Amino acid sequence: MTPIPFPKLMEWILVEKEHVFGIKQIFKPVSHRHLNLFNEKLEIPCGPAAGPHTQLAQNIIAAYLAGARFFELKTVQTLDGEDLPVDKPCIRAEDECYNVEWSTELTVPEALEEYIKAWFALKLMSKEFDLGAPNGFIFNMSVGYDLEGIRSNKINAFIEGLKDASSTPIWHACIEWAKSHLQAFQFIDETYLLGISSHISSSVTLSTLHGCPPDEIERIATYLLKEKGLHTYIKCNPTLLGYDFTRTILNQMGYDYLVFDTHHFEHDLQLSLIHI
């Protein structure tokens, strides 16, 4: 996996502005209405969840062009890059699809750079191509998988870098490239560039492994809320559906040959319905 340098990325976008990355029908909001979320504006309440499609800048840009405005960025953890023992590509689809992905296939610093590049590119594109409000989209970071890892220096630097990217080398590189290429834009000047917010994300989605104890999830959420000051989502694992329900659904759909036991269902969070 090879990230595209920001200058090359922007040159590509400016050349292919009518069909960037092969997207021939570029979305533009027809209304000036928006939602308010985390004290930010959101033009459209939809977008990609964390996955392989939100780990490279060009994937995020393509999703924006197709209409996405809320982006759950690919999850990061302390185990990253070549140290991550997962077969690539992460998703194998033949008849049924086996999703063996974990966290980002990049290193954590590389992931941070990709998200900053994507943010800056969208700020330029939305203004230059009149694709909607430059502040009409939201980036939501995603971290995992235990408190020790999330509190590590590596993940802390990632979180702080997205809370405010102004001190990162890639942010300054994006600014300098844009300043030196103002002639390539019709509707962007230096005043606009200096007004681009370096506060990329004020929210986080917590991703935990199957079997993570409820009290560990609570400790992580408390840390993210109180110590990091982030609006926090907790991602619910599909084992909450229960073994019997999951087994029945798969059998009914013709996947009765898929084999799995009750282990993760029994040791993961349990869903209890309270009738009032």
Summary of predicted features, one role per range:
Residues M1-E227:
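N-terminal capping/small domains of soluble enzymes
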Residues E72, Y233-K235:
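Conserved beta-strand positions in the central sheet of alpha/beta enzyme cores
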Residues D83-P85, D244-T248:
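Short acidic, glycine/serine/threonine-rich loops at helix termini
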Residues F187-S201, T205, T246-E266:
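A solvent-exposed, charged loop/short amphipathic helix patch at secondary-structure junctions
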Residues S207-P213, K235-N237, H264-L271:
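Catalytic beta/alpha-barrel core
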Residues C212-E218, L240-F245, S272:
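Active-site-adjacent beta->alpha loops and helix N-cap segments on the catalytic face
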Residues C236-L240, Y257-V259:
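Non-catalytic helical/linker scaffolds that mediate oligomerization, partner binding
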Residues I274-I276:
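Conserved small/polar residues in nucleotide/adenosyl-binding loops
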